[in-house]
Amino acid sequence: MKTPSWPKRPLALLTAVSLLPMALLASHAQADCERGALDALYCDENGDMVADRPADESSWANPSTLIFAYTPVEDPAIYSDIWQPFVDHLSEVTGRDVRFFAVQSNAAQVEAMRSGRLHIAGFSTGPTPFAVNLAGAVPFALMGSDDGQFGYTLQMFTHVDSDIESLEDLKGKRVAHTSPTSNSGNLAPRALLPELGITPDEDYEVVYSGSHDQSMLGVVARDYDAAPVASEVVERMAARGLYDEEDVRLIYESDRFPTTSYNYAHNLHPDLVEKIEEAFFTFDFVGTELGEEFEGVEKFIPINYQEHWQVIRTIQAANDVRYTRENLE
């Protein structure tokens, strides 16, 4: 398989966050205001689909220690060292201590920001709208190239020795989706494949593997007949030697989707937000472990949720997704 490349602490704090009674947060629900699909904790008076900064300046957060977490798509332990050059840069620019937390689930990550214990986060594509609507996350950056290109594709793989040559051949097969909220691993296939003549759950059996890497390794081991996965994930897996590209066959690839969004909490002090954005947009990937891990990425590029996540919201709407804590798994 050959496709173009693109792109420390214990979990005790985030675990505690996920257990924080939501009743405490509900007590701070905003008075009647325009909020669109946002949770009652937030307002959206300007209609940009993300939470407004609180009008009361006393509610602005200006922590001396910033907590940063990256999406739990793959083995989280790997990323503590990979992200360290950026964490150091973020600390230098903001003048704050910055701590990287490895998270085990999308739900824990969203709950951590919702409760105010997580200040900056990379949320994967599908969970980003949950983070925006449930946790007041404000997406502002993506990884991209110098010419502004960014994103990843949905790729459908099967084992090289299987009898599956096209999507049509998936009928009657056992196909691994990743998780219910994953874009490329579940929602996009459910929205896009029926137009191509194959409907998940009707034409093939869906089983959830739990992650993109487990889906891919399951295809290699022939535990699954096929799997839809994110191109950027399998490319990084191949680069680390986690599977042999010659063991799989690519039978479908979609157009590009936005990749992991980088967000700050809606209630951060505007001066701090300015420094956070400066840190992201001045970080040099060249010669760092982060640059090596995300091959083809050269910088962070500015984005806005309303525009760049429109295709994802459309896919989720087609799947009747509701942005509730119960649906975030």
Report residues per predicted region:
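Periplasmic-binding protein-like
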Residues: 71-72, 146-155, 182-184, 242-314
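Bilobed "Venus flytrap"/periplasmic-binding protein-like clamshell domains
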Residues: 68-91, 126, 149-217, 224-226, ...
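Bacterial N-terminal signal peptides
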Residues: 14-23
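Acidic, polar ligand-binding/catalytic clefts
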Residues: 111-169
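Ligand-binding "clamshell"
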Residues: 131-143, 237-251
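N-terminal hydrophobic or amphipathic helices and topogenic motifs
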Residues: 27-108, 292-329
